[in-house]
């Protein structure tokens, strides 16, 4: 495969510094995982803060998370400075600059760079087949995690929601909400921190360990799988994959921003500075981004699976081959120009120019033969697309929007601990999961 001058410079730089860059890349990925594990463990012991007693284990895990988060930012900065030495990586500086502030974006940068280093000398056609299999496995993993999340969440919430709805009739429930609001708003922060039986009605339903296993871990797993999908799509860099790539980019940025704001609100403003109740409300509003991020990741994975299992993947491969052909033409044009200049000074180079022309002609015919062969093979071997119409995808997006609206309503009820009305979000999530596997 011929490369343009800039691509050749990039490849030479990565080949020369491969082991050096891999060391920092693997270090950033390990720090990310330690950062996530620390956050998960800190979240599982979070109850101690609200009960008025500082849990030393919780405090240690938050400190570890802070240390590993800073390490991720530091290593991302080192990688940025390393790549900046090569002019062909100037376009990546914006992404690495964002990664300095947002750990999830830094993780995506590291995954992308590791892919570049791992597949330096691979043939493009074979490489695309490997990536196709990776994308299929990742999207199927997203489906499975989403399904497990919906089933477990429904099994936890449904019995308790039915029990509470049997206790409170709807008119009485509305009156109870108004009474609770009138009690909370005058001095909401003291009320929440002082009345653990009310504030932790949620934890009476779901203890800390099930909350960790059934909610935190699936959420982080799903968003992390989205990071891997983002890295592979960015590595392919195809115009036909721009929509899922843009969606995943927005998801990553939203979860990064929400994570930082939530950290500030929970650890600094709400706990240590004893701020008004409005901060607590903002905290619950921010948490709505997580369901949105999970839905965005899920819908993006559907789009990706559709493309890699249909004839659209053929178009992506042809696009990549056309880019390769264009690069060949550019290189041959540059080489021909050099040879023509040399011919003016040395007539003996005429034979070399003829040989180059013959090589160029044979290379072009070989490329066309591969393209036609690829098109013929793809028409025979590629399976029929499971999405013959847009009906299934429309239903999934429609149900996702409805579930997000219900989650918004339900989060208010959860924060006031009156009724677990967010159960429709999980039920509809299960319906989405069911429709997805039927359509595959």
Curated annotation (Swiss-Prot):
The keyword Hydrolase does not apply. The chain crosses the membrane at residues 26-46, 59-79, 96-116, 138-158, 211-231, 241-261, 263-283, 284-304, 394-414, 418-438. It is a multi-pass membrane protein. It comes from the Bacteria. GO terms for cellular component: plasma membrane. It is found in: Cell membrane. Keywords: Cell membrane, Membrane, Transmembrane, Transmembrane helix. Disulfide bonds: none annotated. To M.pneumoniae MPN_087. This is Uncharacterized protein MPN_085.
């Amino acid at each position: 495969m011929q490369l343009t001058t800039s691509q050749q410079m990039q490849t030479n730089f990565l080949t020369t510094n491969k082991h050096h860059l891999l060391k920092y890349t693997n270090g950033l990925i390990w720090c990310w995982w330690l950062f996530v594990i620390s956050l998960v463990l800190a979240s599982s012991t979070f109850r101690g803060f609200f009960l008025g007693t500082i849990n030393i284990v919780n405090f240690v895990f938050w400190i570890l998370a802070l240390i590993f988060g800073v390490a991720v930012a530091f290593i991302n900065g080192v990688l940025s400075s390393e790549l900046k030495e090569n002019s062909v990586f100037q376009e990546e500086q914006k992404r690495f600059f964002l990664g300095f502030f947002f750990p999830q974006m830094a993780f995506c940068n590291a995954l992308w760079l590791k892919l570049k280093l791992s597949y330096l000398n691979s043939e493009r056609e074979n490489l695309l087949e490997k990536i196709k299999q990776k994308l299929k496995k990742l999207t199927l993993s997203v489906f499975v995690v989403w399904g497990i999340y919906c089933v477990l969440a429904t099994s936890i919430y449904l019995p308790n929601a039915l029990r509470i709805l049997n206790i409170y009739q709807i008119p009485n429930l509305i009156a109870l909400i108004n009474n609770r609001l009138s009690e909370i708003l005058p001095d909401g922060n003291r009320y929440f921190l002082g009345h653990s039986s009310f504030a932790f009605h949620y934890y009476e339903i779901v203890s800390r360990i099930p909350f960790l296993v059934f909610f935190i871990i699936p959420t982080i797993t799903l968003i992390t799988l989205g990071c891997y999908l983002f890295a592979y799509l960015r590595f392919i860099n195809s115009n036909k994959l721009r929509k899922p790539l843009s969606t995943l980019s927005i998801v990553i940025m939203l979860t990064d921003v929400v994570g930082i704001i939530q950290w500030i609100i929970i650890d600094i403003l709400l706990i240590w500075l004893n701020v008004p109740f409005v901060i607590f409300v903002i905290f619950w509003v921010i948490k709505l981004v997580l369901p949105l991020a999970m839905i965005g990741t899920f819908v993006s994975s559907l789009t990706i699976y559709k493309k890699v299992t249909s004839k659209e993947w053929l178009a992506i491969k042809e696009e990549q081959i056309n880019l390769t052909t264009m690069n060949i033409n550019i290189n041959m044009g540059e080489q021909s120009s050099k040879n023509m200049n040399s011919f003016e000074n040395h007539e003996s180079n005429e034979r070399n120019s003829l040989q180059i022309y013959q090589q160029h002609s044979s290379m072009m015919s070989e490329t066309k033969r591969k393209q036609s062969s690829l098109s013929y093979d793809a028409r025979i071997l590629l399976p029929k697309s499971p999405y013959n119409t847009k009906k299934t995808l429309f239903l999934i997006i429609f149900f996702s929007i409805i579930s997000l609206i219900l989650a918004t309503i339900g989060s208010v009820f959860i924060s006031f601990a009156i009724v677990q009305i967010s159960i429709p979000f999980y039920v509809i999530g299960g319906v989405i999961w069911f429709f997805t596997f039927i359509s595959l």
